[in-house]
Amino acid sequence: MGQIKDILTTLLPLVVLFLIFYFLIVRPQRQQQKKHKEMIESLTKGDKIVTQGGLIVEVLKAEANFFSVKLNDDTTAKLSKNYVAFKLDELDQFGLAEPIVIQQGREEISAKLSGAKTLKQRQITTE
């Protein structure tokens, strides 16, 4: 009976640490990977995506392991499905698809993440 208690008191902290590790790191990562895979499988012609390299491209055709994408009016390329970062529409959920204007003194730097014309500009003042 005493040996079983010793084994339980030794293993219990390890089991608790494993459970904490699983629920805080492994499980959320698997859920995120599952959502990303579903997003990649749902991409169709005309969807705009952002690559892991930061390029904003439009999907022309989905193939087995690649997407045929349009970089601009004249340039098409093939993109591995492994290098899709996210769908551009996902930014709209967080309000990040609006043009961003950064003011530093007298200089203005504007960046536009999507081509929509009816978006409001955000003012971010840095000092």
UniProtKB/Swiss-Prot annotation:
It is a single-pass membrane protein. GO terms for biological process: protein transport. Keywords: Cell inner membrane, Cell membrane, Membrane, Protein transport, Translocation, Transmembrane, Transmembrane helix, Transport. The chain crosses the membrane at residues 6-26. It is found in: Cell inner membrane. The SecYEG-SecDF-YajC-YidC holo-translocon (HTL) protein secretase/insertase is a supercomplex required for protein secretion, insertion of proteins into membranes, and assembly of membrane protein complexes. While the SecYEG complex is essential for assembly of a number of proteins and complexes, the SecDF-YajC-YidC subcomplex facilitates these functions. Part of the SecDF-YidC-YajC translocase complex. The SecDF-YidC-YajC translocase forms a supercomplex with SecYEG, called the holo-translocon (HTL). This is Sec translocon accessory complex subunit YajC.
